[in-house]
């Protein structure tokens, strides 16, 4: 039967910041009466509901704050794609033990094979596990650091970048860096080394990163620290990005970032 809560109870729940319980409590009480659930067990169920809700809300906020692509999650990776990589290694990375061990991840491969997708998917898992994550393209990172020098906020920005549990730098080493940018990246790699996890995606192997830095000694020191504490995930194969192209269907356009499983076209009767 339908049950309404007493206004006094609703007011008390809201005062304790338990307002969301109001929507589910009547159903839980009805279930408890039907199944002869004790008050203690009912209280546990109700509080478990609220804990789950708060965890879900917190995870959603962490994902938003991280700047992750919302659709680049493990469940949406198209397993039929002709992109090749070490599935066993990626499964290990999905366990997030590398985050707990403060190890790094280097994701290498040509343009369009899904490096960003797999990096973001790891970021989503880390957010769900209550880790703080930041995803940022390398060019945007360097812009923020340049701006921070101008407005005297560099120390605060560097502290933020060094303290986040998982920092994902996308498309690193595409363009040469200035002397200041090289020093910034050196400091970032060195201060995060063995203290927090860094995921880097790049089209270039670490040996090709050296000319990108303005200072060869800084480059060698930074790269050596990063790569010797990193898992290497190497991707190869056909472009995964082509699967994210907009497609026409009876249901309208698919959301951006959602892969389309391609099928072989069937021959019409008239073509036979």
PLM regions and their residue ranges:
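Walker B motif beta-strand of ABC-family P-loop ATPases
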Residues: 166
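Conserved adenine-nucleotide phosphate-binding loops and their immediately adjacent elements
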Residues: 65-79
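Charged, compositionally biased N-terminal leader segments and the immediate start
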Residues: 1-21
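Interdomain "pre-motor" coupling segment immediately N-terminal to P-loop NTPase/helicase cores
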Residues: 14, 18-69
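Conserved P-loop
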Residues: 85-163, 210
């Amino acid at each position: 039967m339908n049950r309404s809560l007493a206004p006094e109870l609703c007011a008390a729940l809201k005062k304790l910041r338990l307002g969301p319980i109001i929507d589910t409590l009547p159903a839980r009480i009805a279930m408890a009466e039907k199944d002869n659930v004790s008050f203690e067990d009912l209280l546990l169920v109700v509080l478990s509901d609220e804990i789950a809700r708060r965890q879900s809300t917190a995870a959603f906020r962490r994902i938003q704050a991280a700047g992750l692509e919302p659709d680049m999650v493990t469940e949406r990776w198209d397993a039929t794609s002709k992109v090749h990589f070490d599935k066993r290694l990626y499964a290990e990375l999905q366990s997030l033990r590398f985050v707990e061990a403060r190890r790094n991840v280097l994701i290498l491969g040509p343009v369009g094979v899904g490096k960003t997708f797999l990096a973001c998917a790891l970021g989503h898992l880390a957010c769900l596990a209550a880790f703080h994550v930041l995803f940022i393209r390398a060019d945007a990172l360097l812009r923020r650091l340049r701006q921070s020098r101008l407005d005297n906020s560099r120390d605060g920005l560097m502290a933020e970048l060094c303290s986040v549990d998982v920092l994902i730098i996308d498309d690193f080493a595409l363009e040469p860096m200035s002397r200041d940018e090289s020093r910034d990246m050196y400091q970032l790699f060195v201060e995060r080394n063995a203290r927090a996890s860094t995921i880097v995606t790049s089209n270039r192997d670490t040996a090709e990163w050296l000319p990108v830095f303005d200072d060869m000694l800084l480059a060698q020191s930074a790269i050596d620290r990063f790569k010797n504490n990193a898992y290497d995930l190497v991707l190869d194969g056909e472009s995964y990005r082509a699967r994210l192209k907009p497609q026409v269907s009876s249901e309208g356009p698919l959301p951006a970032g959602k892969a389309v499983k391609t099928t072989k076209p069937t021959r019409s009767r008239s073509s036979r």
